């Protein structure tokens, strides 16, 4: 080609130019070294579109003296096809150049001027400005709009490179394996060396070997390195800043072939910031490409999120932030939060597990099985190195609530993970994810139920579903091993945070079924009856929200298990409660619970909510689980209402057998109840559900009641003391609330009353244990609940029952009804509650009943009256507080109004002063203008007289200024 005359060469390039891809190809062996080193490959993608070729003005074509330029007449107009689009060309200085503006408006119209300009500079393309004559020619040829004032022209080869950088495929030039460019620079005394493309895998790579001293330099350092040879003359580099090397480094062979010079341009364009669309090939490993090129392991490892090459050591890191998600990545799912320990990588295919990837192969591509926590590329290495303690699993970035779970993150959504239920088995996340979806979602990173992570469910797996028996067992074990601290994320349930409610409910249903299938499920259930979110599954008592109870409600203690079982959907309930993970026992107060010590304030705060909940779908959280309610926000308020452990059973348990706060049952009972419970939920649901109006307070009672009744058959030692929450529903909403609040279960502890702070509120609110603040209440409650022991549960119902039945209306009458009711009941008829509640529970323990009768006869009236008085006092107190709040608020409003008026006045003053100043300035300006005009006119007049007396004789057109 070089032989062809300039014309030939150019035209050849224009018309024959090989398909763009081939342009860069020097046909030698496909650069093995390159590829091997990962260097070029990475580069290519790195280069991102366009960077590849960079033609410097010296590109062959331009330099070539066009001997035959005569054939190309100056300013000759032609048309060239670029990527199929006709572009006007013009011969300038013997070279055919294309109109850059036309290219920008056609081929590159989707890119901004800045992008095109920056890419052009990065590629080293110099733009020649055309003369006005040439511009006119271009306008007439239709290349430029009439309004244009200038036009830059670039050669065809440069235009191809520019377009290819935006539109084409980006392969680094293919060079032979041990190829090197012989380069020289003339900065200072100059130097020469070999530029080894295979080593050029980052902008700072030491890829130039000095020909004199054989040391290696990076391109931008090499131009500062020179050897003073005898014949060398010193040249002050014009712009020797670090990145000008592309201009100063030239091929030593001035007559290099086109292919060679084009390859050189492409190499020079490689790490030039031309394109910000960095697509790092899988080689995320390099933390951004720096040394990524080197190892296969690196490639794909981090980047692929466990993708292809993933050496187990790399698997965990999230890919360097920039890494492009390649197909594989996507398939495997973006790498999740860096798992604290590589092997435990959650989805990350338990490190070595390979493609199991976040979702395992199943992890449907693209679906994020868990939120990606972007880690800046440099640091990501650190995460892996951090000592595990940094992210102990219990709260490592839980995938469950990844830093910010996206509602769509499949796993989180209880339904089926987006990936499709199937995903589950695939990867660590699989079991849970697939099975129940949510399940896995909540595992802490280390916990992939599958492979390496002890599946520690956070607290418990929020979704009841998705627990395989195995997983469950693991969960229990894990839980024991790593106490689940609801640390960052209060245990999954502690807040509504937990899995998205709605989904959850469905998931729960499903989950329930699934779980039921596996006995283990029950175990898991300990951790996780699906938690019910507020209204989410009002009806499902089974889910009862209890699941979450444990961590969040804290109410669950050892009982929790039971609670969990209660929570379990009926089908599950029967399973034996798993031993609760020890960790659970300690009740943590959820950070999210309002720290309000007295139920009243909470009631005040959330009273309305309560009612809403109470009446809401059959009381939102399932009654059965007091705690479930706990989760309900109101409930949870109530739960938290006493900021001390709401009902942490542990507390009670000090002297007495643990009683589920919610149900006031002994654990043993619970066992029994659990069996019956399934029915309970339904019953609870029934009664409670039935009386939506009934303050959820019923919940505990309801749940308890039903359960009791259910159990009722199996006489189980009932807590004689606990006047149950029975009262709760009995009273009207508030009454119920308060009653509930008051209802203390008078445990032997007596010390704690069971109060449902917001009965209605939480409806589900479990009866809470309160400090003996109101022992009297306790007693009264006991009396009231007179149901006392056995009945106490049922009794509660009794009382409840009255409530329930009569008091659905939840009015003060309830109290009376209750009284009468209790009296009647005292008769020891099976408490209506029982009858009411569940036929199953019809039989009361006789002993319980008798006790109840006595208690009721003796205490009921007085207690009820006391309660009534208390309620009245409470109400008055609330009214007073409300009044004071109102007054404060009004004062504040007044203050704010006064302040606002003051501000308005000040603004007015400022505005007035500004206006005055402006007026004065205007006047001053006007005066100055007048003076200037006068001076000007005077000068004009004077000059007329002086300079042209002849023309101005007598009839001068000057008119004296009109004086104001």
Swiss-Prot record:
Look up the coiled coil feature and give its residue ranges. Answer: 857-921
Q: Where is the composition biased (Acidic residues)?
A: 652-661
Where is the protein situated, by its record's location annotation? Nucleus
Q: Name one GO molecular function term.
A: SMAD binding
One BP term from GO: negative regulation of BMP signaling pathway
Entry keyword annotation includes Transmembrane: no
Main subcellular localization, coarse class?
A: nucleus
Main role? Inhibits BMP signaling. Acts as a transcriptional corepressor of LBX1.
Q: How does it assemble?
A: Interacts with LBX1. Interacts with SMAD1, SMAD2 and SMAD3.
Spell out the protein name for this chain: SKI family transcriptional corepressor 1
């Amino acid at each position: 080609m070089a032989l062809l005359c300039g014309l030939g060469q150019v035209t050849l390039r224009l018309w024959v130019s090989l398909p763009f891809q081939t342009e860069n190809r020097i046909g030698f062996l496909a650069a093995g070294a390159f590829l091997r080193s990962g260097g070029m490959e990475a580069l290519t993608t790195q280069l991102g579109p366009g960077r590849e070729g960079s033609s410097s003005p010296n590109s062959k074509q331009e330099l070539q003296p066009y001997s035959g330029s005569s054939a190309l007449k100056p300013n000759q107009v032609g048309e060239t096809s670029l990527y199929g689009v006709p572009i006007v060309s013009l011969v300038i200085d013997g070279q055919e150049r294309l109109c850059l503006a036309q290219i920008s408006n056609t081929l590159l119209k989707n890119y901004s001027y800045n992008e095109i300009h920056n890419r052009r500079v990065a590629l080293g393309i110099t733009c020649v400005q055309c003369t006005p004559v040439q511009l006119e020619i271009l306008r007439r040829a239709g290349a430029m709009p009439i309004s244009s004032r200038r036009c830059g022209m670039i050669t065809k080869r440069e235009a191809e490179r520019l377009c290819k950088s935006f539109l084409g495929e980006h392969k680094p030039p293919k060079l032979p394996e041990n190829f090197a460019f012989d380069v020289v620079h003339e900065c200072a005394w100059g130097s020469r060396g070999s530029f080894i493309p295979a080593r050029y895998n980052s902008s700072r790579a030491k890829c130039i070997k000095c020909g004199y001293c054989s040391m290696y330099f990076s391109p931008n350092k090499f131009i500062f390195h020179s050897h003073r040879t005898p014949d060398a003359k010193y040249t002050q580099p014009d712009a020797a800043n670090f990145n000008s090397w592309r201009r100063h480094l030239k091929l030593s062979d001035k007559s290099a072939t086109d292919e060679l010079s084009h390859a050189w341009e492409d190499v020079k364009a490689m790490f030039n910031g031309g394109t910000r669309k960095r697509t790092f090939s899988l080689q995320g490993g390099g933390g951004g490409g720096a040394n990524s090129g080197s190892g296969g392991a690196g490639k794909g490892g981090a980047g692929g999120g466990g993708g292809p090459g993933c050496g187990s050591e790399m698997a965990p890191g999230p890919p360097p932030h920039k890494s492009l998600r390649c197909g594989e990545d996507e398939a495997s799912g973006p790498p999740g939060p860096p798992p604290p320990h590589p092997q435990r990588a959650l989805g990350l295919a338990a490190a070595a597990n390979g493609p199991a990837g976040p979702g395992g192969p199943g992890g449907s591509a693209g679906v994020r099985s868990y939120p990606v926590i972007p880690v800046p590329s440099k640091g990501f290495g650190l995460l892996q190195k951090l000592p595990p303690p940094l992210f102990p699993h219990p709260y490592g970035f839980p995938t469950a609530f990844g830093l910010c779970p996206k509602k769509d993150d499949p796993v989180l959504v209880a339904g089926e993970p987006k990936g499709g239920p199937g995903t589950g088995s695939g990867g660590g996340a699989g079991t849970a994810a697939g099975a129940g979806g949510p399940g896995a979602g909540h595992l802490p990173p280390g916990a992939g139920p599958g492979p390496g992570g002890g599946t520690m469910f956070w607290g418990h797996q929020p979704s009841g579903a998705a627990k395989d028996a195995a997983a469950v067992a693991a969960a229990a074990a894990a839980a024991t091993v790593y106490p689940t601290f609801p640390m960052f994320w209060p245990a999954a349930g502690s807040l509504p945070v937990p899995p998205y409610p709605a989904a959850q409910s469905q998931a729960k249903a499903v989950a329930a079924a699934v779980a039921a299938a596996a006995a283990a499920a029950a175990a898991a259930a300990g951790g996780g009856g699906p938690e019910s979110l507020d209204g989410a599954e009002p009806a499902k008592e089974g889910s009862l929200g209890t699941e979450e109870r444990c961590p969040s409600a804290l109410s669950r203690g050892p009982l929790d298990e039971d609670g969990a079982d209660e929570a379990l959907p009926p089908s599950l309930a029967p399973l034996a409660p798993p031993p609760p993970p020890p960790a659970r026992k300690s009740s943590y107060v959820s950070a999210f619970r309002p720290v309000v010590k007295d139920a009243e304030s909470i009631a005040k705060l959330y009273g309305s909510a309560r009612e809403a909940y109470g009446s809401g779908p059959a009381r939102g959280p399932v009654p059965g689980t007091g705690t479930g309610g706990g989760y309900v926000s109101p409930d949870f308020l109530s739960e938290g209402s006493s900021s001390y452990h709401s009902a942490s059973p542990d507390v009670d348990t000090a002297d007495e057998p643990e009683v589920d706060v919610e149900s006031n049952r002994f654990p043993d009972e619970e066992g029994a109840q659990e069996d019956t419970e399934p029915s309970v939920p339904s019953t609870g649901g029934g009664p409670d559900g039935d009386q939506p109006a009934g303050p959820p307070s019923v919940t505990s009672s309801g749940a308890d009641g039903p359960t009791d009744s259910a159990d009722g058959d199996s006489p189980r030692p009932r807590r004689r003391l606990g006047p149950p929450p029975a009262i709760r529903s009995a009273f009207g909403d508030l009454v119920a609330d308060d009653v509930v609040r008051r209802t203390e279960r008078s445990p032997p502890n007596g010390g704690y009353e069971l109060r449902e702070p917001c009965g209605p509120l939480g409806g589900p609110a479990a009866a809470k244990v309160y400090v003996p603040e109101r022992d009297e209440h306790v007693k009264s409650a006991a009396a009231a609940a007179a149901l006392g022991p056995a009945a106490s549960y049922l009794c509660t119902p009794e009382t409840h029952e009255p409530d329930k039945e009569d008091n659905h209306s939840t009015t003060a009458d309830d109290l009376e009804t209750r009284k009468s009711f209790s009296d009647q009941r005292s008769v020891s008829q099976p408490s209506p509650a029982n009858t009411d509640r569940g036929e199953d529970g019809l039989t009361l323990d006789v002993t319980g009943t008798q006790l109840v009768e006595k208690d009721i006869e003796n205490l009921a009236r007085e207690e009820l009256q006391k309660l009534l008085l208390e309620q009245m006092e409470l109400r008055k107190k609330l009214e007073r507080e409300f009044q004071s709040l109102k007054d404060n608020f009004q004062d504040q409003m007044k203050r704010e109004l006064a302040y606002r008026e003051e501000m308005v006045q000040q603004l007015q003053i400022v505005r007035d002063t500004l206006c005055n100043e402006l007026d004065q300035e205007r006047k001053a300006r006007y005066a100055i203008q007048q003076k200037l005009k006068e001076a000007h006119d005077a000068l004009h007049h004077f000059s007329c007289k002086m300079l042209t007396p002849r023309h101005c004789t007598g009839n001068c057109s000057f008119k004296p200024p009109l004086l104001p």
